[in-house]
Amino acid sequence: QRDIILTAFDLGITHFDLANNYGPPYGSAERNFGQILRSDLAGHRDELIISTKAGWDMWPGPYGELGSRKYLLASLDQSLDRLGLDYVDIFYSHRFDHETPLEETMGALHTAVQSGRALYAGISSYNPQRTREAAAILRDLGTPLLIHQPSYSMLNRWIEREALLDVLADEGVGAIGFSPLAQGMLTDRYLAGIPADSRAAQGKSLAPQWLTDENRERLAALNALAHSR
């Protein structure tokens, strides 16, 4: 992991995107990155954009996930402790919470920025309507919504179909996609089916239903195109 991060930095990559539950175990990605930051990149902090998120399950109980003010700010404090930082550059609401008023969730992001624990506020995986509402709430609070992180790949273009990109353009909000390789499908990992040791076989982040006959045909065609170059 250290070699990957340092090689990326040496090649000009300065944005490192994390979340409280990245692991396993939860928190380990932040903790490991924090150790590498202290040992190898401490003198380069002002060159780096470091982001983290909260929204998915992190600890037991009603305040261990989703979008309550209590959870988001407690999680951010824990993330900063694991990273060994006073602030992150971007703090995201990792997913929309149907059980918490959006005003509360965006208010927590506003507090994170106003308190100096984050420089900018972001959201992830919000649909177009909720994105527009979130941007309006933050605008009224005086903390602009900087960025949205949706899933996006050649096989998953929902942000085009559902006009999320149009909403972001209207609101002046940036976009940075996650899973650009479609959770591994846009590699050669699944060309011959589902390997026994793969995430799809283990029922993790890549659902087997994504590997439809149509997508298999697309993958085979893309693989042939790649090998012809």
Regions found by a protein language model. Give the residues of each.
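Short, acidic/polar
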Residues: 1-8, 66-84, 102-104, 131-135
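N-terminal binding-site loop/beta-alpha segment at the start of enzyme catalytic domains
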Residues: 1-48, 114
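Glycine-centered flexible beta-alpha turn that most often forms the glycine-rich phosphate-binding loop
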Residues: 16, 88, 121
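A short, structured active-site edge motif that brings together acidic residues
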Residues: 45-58, 149-152
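Active-site mouth loops of central-metabolism enzymes
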Residues: 57-73, 94-100
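Active-site groove signature of glycoside hydrolases
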Residues: 80-100
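Beta/alpha (TIM)-barrel catalytic core signal, keyed to glycine-rich beta->alpha loops juxtaposed to Asp/Glu
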Residues: 96-229
